[in-house]
Swiss-Prot record:
The record marks 108 as: Important for catalytic activity. The lineage of its organism: Eukaryota, Viridiplantae, Streptophyta, Embryophyta, Tracheophyta. Belongs to the chalcone isomerase family. It comes from the Eukaryota. Its EC number is 5.5.1.6. It catalyses: a chalcone = a flavanone. This is Chalcone--flavanone isomerase. One of its GO terms (molecular function) is chalcone isomerase activity. Substrate binds at residues 50, 192. It comes from Callistephus chinensis. Pathway: Secondary metabolite biosynthesis; flavonoid biosynthesis. One of its GO terms (biological process) is flavonoid biosynthetic process. Keywords: Flavonoid biosynthesis, Isomerase.
Length: 237
């Protein structure tokens, strides 16, 4: 078994993402793969909406490293397949979306739903069951209001379920608000952040940089090398 990677926590604006968390609906502790801001250029200013942290189960490192010996951060960042493997890999993922600006649950869920349904219809994979899941997804969010500092939390299980939880104060609750059994939606939520057209390039950059270091460390340790890189000097500021 691969030991828990030694990672640092990260701060995005005023949001602190700890180095590991135990997500709602999970029995595992997951490590912080990367974190970054989500924003948009509005009238010449970059307006920041949310900070996003992506956590992964320990076994993600050997699985991702197997195909990517010696890849640079830039090569990982340019690789659609690398991020696709994070999205679809057989390990648990946890995505924390914390508000910098206020947002209503209705605004958030409608945007995510629209995007998912659009992609599924384009791929010809949209079904009645997906329609039912999307209705449930919209229902969970409809009365929620997210003030700055509050979070939307998604636990993506390799068995195909999506656990959704809300936090008003930065703590991670133990109980879930809802569990949806739909693998496509479970993957789509994380893909919307780090996929080919993901909304947070900063989170992708952070993941590529930190996972590159961790995969290098894993390769060296598996090759019996005693030279373990000092990750602190490469960590994202």
């Amino acid at each position: 078994e691969f030991p828990t990677p030694l990672t640092t926590g990260l701060q995005v604006e005023s949001i602190v993402f700890p180095s590991s968390v135990k997500p709602p609906g999970s029995t595992n502790s997951l490590f912080l793969g990367g974190a970054g801001v989500r924003g948009m250029e509005i009238q010449g200013n970059f307006v920041k909406f949310t900070g996003i942290g992506v956590y992964l189960e320990d076994k993600a490192i050997p699985l991702l490293a197997a195909k990517r010996k010696g890849k640079t951060v830039a090569e990982l960042l340019d690789s659609v397949e690398f991020f696709r493997d994070i999205v679809t890999g057989p390990f648990e993922k946890f995505t924390q979306v914390t508000m910098i600006l206020p947002l209503t649950g209705k605004q958030y869920s409608e945007k995510v739903s629209e995007m998912c349904v659009g992609v599924w219809k384009a791929l010809g994979t949209y079904t009645d069951a997906d329609g039912t899941t999307i209705e449930k997804f919209l229902e969970v969010f409809k009365d929620e209001n997210f003030l700055p500092g509050s979070s939307i939390l998604f636990t993506t299980s390799p068995l195909g379920s999506l656990t959704i939880s809300f936090s008003k104060d930065g703590t991670i609750p133990e109980a879930a608000n809802v569990v949806l059994e739909n693998e496509k939606l479970a993957q789509a939520v994380i893909e919307s952040v780090i996929g080919k057209n993901g909304v947070s390039p900063a989170t992708k950059q952070s993941l590529a940089s930190r996972l590159s270091d961790l995969m290098k460390q894993f390769d060296e340790e598996s090759n019996g090398s005693v030279e373990v890189e000092d990750l602190s000097k490469n960590s994202c500021k």
